[in-house]
């Protein structure tokens, strides 16, 4: 955002005597400070001259320019707004004011100021970005057509590609510019950032190294390096990369401090999230998403939903997270509407051209079919990236359910037993599906042991019902009878007696057929005696008679 220098910024023939000159100390010229990008020094010089009455024309514009490049947008705004109130205000001031509004997030004001400026490439680039902010595709394409094959315009286009998740298109532009301008080192950071977004973390590191060799203390580059380490290794390795930043970040670079604090929360697995992330929600875009993830991990689905419900998703990550939150809330509330919204979000991402062949895209399609209960389709997608998630508990949980739901309970059992998370292993969905797998795989005793480890609750009652009914269907009458016996004691429902009676008769038949040990009859009689039904005595009499005839001790 360079200001026109049609009028000299320093020394227009007016000579002033300065006491410090007499002492032989040379005051630096504004041009020298600007060429060195010493914006703090430039502001100091301009304010000093203003204070001693040596203020020159356009001083306020130069202060605004320097403040803008220091990231002090409020100060820049103050200077530019004052400049627009002057007579014969240069129309170029309006585009500088508009850029300042833009960086303050005041997009409506930025657009109004931008249209007051004279037409220029900078004005077009600004309006191009505003059209993206407003999701106005018609205006976006209109300003896109005005872009020229010059570096600034092409960088602006690459930026829009990046923000629209068109990372490869952005990379192509950056690489083309770098071919002719090797000195534009910072473009390597942009390329590395694109590769990071494409999940090519090792490639991102290689490209980033080119820049860090020349600028080893770059805040943005070191932060990106830390993020790559987080993805490639773990949070501890990433935190080590940030240590030098935490030690050296200047007090004036407040955004860097906020970025570091934000990323440390992520690297530490959410530690300190409630203290750090809420104030950053409207400062760092990812802060809102990471706070939502934190709430989900704490099982606070309602808070997660409250934080994301008004967010209009524009990136795959935002669509995915809205899908996850709606799915979780739908399950918690039994809401079909939320489940349908989740399914639509997942389908939108998984079916998009840019995401369909990525792992997140395939995860979305698996989730979509999971919600539709089309488990054969779920497995097609899960199998396509299974090798990347062998030790991932969440993947194994979903994979096991899909396998069990399609009747492959043997592989379902294997996947369930790979899960390490104690929280997940105590979840009723896990317990009920694993119990079902055990029963279908002719291991009813293991299913019964799952129940014995549970405390008395509504969930343990439900698991008893599952064991009782599924064991009955599978002809595993002994554990079916035991389950129906406990159910009958907890709830004198006639249906439980009928189930228990049928299971006991089933065991008796299996004993007669030699498919069950004769000693089991003693326990069957014990189960029957615990019921006060009139049919019990008749059943016991028949069983005792058979036992006597077959010399079975009861």
UniProtKB/Swiss-Prot annotation:
Residues 1-24 are annotated as: Disordered. Its main location: other. The lineage of its organism: Eukaryota, Metazoa, Chordata, Craniata, Vertebrata. Belongs to the IFT56 family. InterPro entries: TPR-like_helical_dom_sf (IPR011990), TPR_rpt (IPR019734), TTC26 (IPR030511). GO terms for cellular component: centrosome; ciliary basal body; ciliary base; ciliary tip; cilium; intraciliary transport particle B; neuron projection. It is found in: Cell projection, Cilium. Component of the intraflagellar transport (IFT) complex B required for transport of proteins in the motile cilium. Required for transport of specific ciliary cargo proteins related to motility, while it is neither required for IFT complex B assembly or motion nor for cilium assembly. Required for efficient coupling between the accumulation of GLI2 and GLI3 at the ciliary tips and their dissociation from the negative regulator SUFU. Plays a key role in maintaining the integrity of the IFT complex B and the proper ciliary localization of the IFT complex B components. It comes from Homo sapiens. GO terms for biological process: axoneme assembly; cilium assembly; intraciliary anterograde transport; intraciliary transport; intraciliary transport involved in cilium assembly; manchette assembly; protein localization to cilium; protein transport. GO terms for molecular function: intraciliary transport particle B binding. SMART domains: TPR (SM00028). Changing residue 263 to S: In BRENS; decreased protein abundance; associated with abnormal ciliary structure and function. Changing residue 444 to L: In BRENS; uncertain significance. The keyword Transport applies. This is Intraflagellar transport protein 56. Component of the IFT complex B. Interacts with IFT46; the interaction is direct. It is linked to Biliary, renal, neurologic, and skeletal syndrome: An autosomal recessive ciliopathy with multisystemic manifestations including severe neonatal cholestasis that progresses to liver fibrosis and cirrhosis, postaxial polydactyly, hydrocephalus, retinal abnormalities, and situs inversus. Additional features may include congenital cardiac defects, echogenic kidneys with renal failure, ocular abnormalities, joint hyperextensibility, and dysmorphic facial features. Some patients have global developmental delay. It comes from the Eukaryota. Keywords: Cell projection, Ciliopathy, Cilium, Disease variant, Protein transport, Repeat, TPR repeat, Transport.
């Amino acid at each position: 955002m360079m200001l026109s220098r049609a009028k000299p910024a320093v020394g227009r023939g007016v000579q002033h005597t300065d006491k410090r000159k007499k002492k032989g100390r040379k005051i630096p010229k504004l041009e020298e400070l600007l060429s060195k990008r010493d914006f703090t020094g430039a502001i100091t010089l301009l304010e000093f001259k203003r204070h001693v009455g040596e203020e020159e024309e356009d001083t306020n514009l130069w202060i605004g320019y320097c403040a803008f490049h220091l990231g002090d947008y409020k100060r820049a705004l103050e200077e530019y707004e004052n400049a627009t109130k002057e007579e014969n205000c240069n129309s170029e001031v309006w585009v500088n004011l508009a850029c300042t509004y833009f960086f303050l997030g005041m997009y409506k004001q930025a657009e109004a100021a931008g249209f007051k400026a004279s037409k220029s490439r900078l004005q077009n680039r600004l309006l191009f970005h505003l059209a993206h902010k407003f999701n106005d595709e018609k205006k976006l394409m209109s300003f896109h057509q005005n872009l020229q094959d010059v570096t600034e315009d092409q960088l602006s286009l690459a930026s829009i590609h990046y923000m629209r998740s068109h990372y490869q298109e952005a990379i192509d532009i950056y690489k083309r510019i770098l071919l002719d301008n090797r000195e534009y080192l910072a473009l390597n950071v942009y390329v590395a950032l694109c590769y990071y977004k494409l999940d090519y973390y090792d490639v991102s590191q290689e490209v980033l190294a080119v820049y860090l060799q020349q600028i080893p203390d770059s805040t943005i580059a070191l932060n990106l390096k830390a993020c790559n380490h987080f993805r490639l290794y773990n949070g501890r390795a990433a935190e080590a990369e940030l240590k030098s930043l935490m030690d050296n970040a200047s007090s004036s670079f407040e955004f860097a401090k906020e970025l570091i604090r934000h990323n440390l929360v992520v690297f530490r697995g959410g530690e300190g999230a409630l203290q750090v992330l809420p104030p950053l929600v409207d400062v760092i875009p990812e802060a809102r998403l990471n706070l939502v993830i934190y709430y989900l991990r704490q099982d606070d689905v309602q808070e997660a939903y409250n934080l994301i419900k008004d967010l209009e998703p524009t990136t795959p990550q935002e669509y995915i997270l809205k899908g996850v939150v709606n799915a979780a809330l739908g399950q918690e509330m039994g809401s079909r509407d939320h489940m349908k919204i989740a399914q639509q979000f997942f389908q939108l991402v998984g079916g998009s051209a840019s995401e369909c062949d990525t792992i997140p895209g395939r995860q979305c399609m698996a989730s979509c079919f999971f919600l539709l209960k089309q488990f054969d389709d779920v497995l097609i997608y899960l199998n396509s990236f299974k090798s990347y998630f062998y030790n991932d508990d969440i993947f194994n949980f979903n994979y096991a359910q899909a396998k069990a739901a399609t009747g492959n309970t043997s592989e379902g059992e294997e996947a369930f037993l790979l899960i390490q998370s104690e929280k997940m292993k105590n979840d009723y969905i896990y317990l009920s599906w694993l119990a079902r797998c055990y029963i279908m795989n002719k291991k009813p005793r293991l299913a019964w042991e799952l129940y014995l480890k549970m405390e008395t609750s509504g969930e343990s009652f439900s698991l008893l019902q599952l064991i009782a009914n599924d064991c009955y269907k599978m002809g595993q009458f002994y554990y079916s009878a035991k389950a129906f016996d406990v159910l009958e004691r907890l709830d004198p429902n006639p249906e439980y007696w009928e189930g228990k009676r049928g299971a006991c008769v089933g065991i008796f038949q299996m004993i007669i057929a030699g498919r069950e040990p004769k000693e089991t009859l003693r326990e069957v009689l014990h189960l029957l005696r615990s019921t006060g039904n009139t049919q019990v005595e008749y059943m016991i009499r028949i069983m005792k008679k058979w036992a006597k005839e077959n010399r079975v001790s009861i």
